[in-house]
Every structure is written in structure tokens, then in C-alpha cells.
Amino acid sequence: SDQSNDDEIQNFCSDNIFDLKINYFRNKNGRGNAALNTNAAMEICTGEVVKLIYMDDFFYTEDSLQKTYDALINSDKMWLVCGTNHTRDEGKTFDHPIYPRWNDRMLKARGNNTMSGTSVISYRNKNMGVRWDANTFGLLDIDFYHSMMGKYGMCVFLDEILVSQRVNNPDNIISTRSSEQIEKEFEYC
């Protein structure tokens, strides 16, 4: 789901030099709202397993998708989170390995997100009844994890780094918000 103001992403998908099956969708609704954009993308997904990955992130290994699919399909769980790491130099070096773990305090205070960012998530598409809350910004991932846990129970923890996240600052999304805005979002969630 593409909310950009230009055609760069659409052109890339059309050129598709990698022979990938890409379902391109131009989303003009709620421009700039990551939750609404992700929900729009979820609505057009057709696969048995859906792997969310955001445009700043990429697969760490060539078999990341296969490993994700196999682990989820061979479980009785609805969703899965995988390990991740960070890169600050376009994939030349990697640091900050994260192996997600559930933490009941994630929505209590800043710094308690032990699951990591949104690109670690995969889920079974059939009967998926959870969507992202458009009123969240910095906590949208944590809020989604809690919603998934409440509806479907614990996820599969795939203890392997399969996704790399491009970061400039580990808190880059939430750091653009004032302390008051962050506190209001914690209260809301």
C-alpha cells in the first residue's frame, strides 16, 4: 500500500526486474498514517501467510520468507514474530540483535518494547480479525501485539534474525513526539 506523493514506488513495482508478484495499491486515504496504510495493505493480501515488512526494512537472509512460512504453518498459532537487527549504513554492518519476547509491561512505559518493530510480524490470513489502531503513532506496534495476544493468544517466537531494520536513531518514530504526546498515547492504549 503506497501513500507516497510521487510515482517512484509504483514505477519500481511496474519495472519489477526481480520477477516478483507484487500487488501494487495506491492508497490516498489517511496519507501519513501508518496504521491506516497497513490496514489497507492487509485488506488486499491473498496469501495463506502474510509477512508484514516496511519499506525501510529488508529480509536478512535469502530464505527468510520460507522460514517464516514453515514455522507458522507448522504451528497451531495465528501469528509469529522473528528476530531482527539494525543497520545504520544500508546493510554493510549490523548490530542490536533482537529476539522478541512477550512483556506485559510494554504498554506501561517507554523502553519496554521487547518485541521490536512492526516488520517482525507475520500472521495467518484466514479469519484475521485484528487491525491497526489509527489513533496510535509511536505505540502502534505494541498496541497491535496486545490486540493479537488478546484475540489469538501467544505467538510463535522464531528465534532467528530474518529481518533487518534501517535505523538512524533507535527511537526515531517516537522521538518526533513531545513527552506530552507520548504520555497521552500511553494513557490511550
Which ranges hold each PLM region?
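Glycine-rich, basic loop-to-helix element that forms the pyrophosphate-binding segment
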Residues: K28-C45
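Short, solvent-exposed loop/turn segments at secondary-structure junctions
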Residues: N5, G30, D56-F58, N85-T87, ...
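Acidic donor-binding segment of Leloir-type glycosyltransferases
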Residues: S1-R26
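Conserved donor NDP-sugar-binding/catalytic core segment of glycosyltransferases
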Residues: F58, D63-F94
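Short, high-confidence coil segments that cap the C-terminus of an alpha-helix
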Residues: G47, S75-M78, Y152-G153
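Conserved nucleotide-sugar donor-binding catalytic segment
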Residues: C82, Y99-Q181, E185
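Short beta-strand-to-loop acidic/aromatic patch adjacent to the donor-nucleotide binding site
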Residues: G47-F58
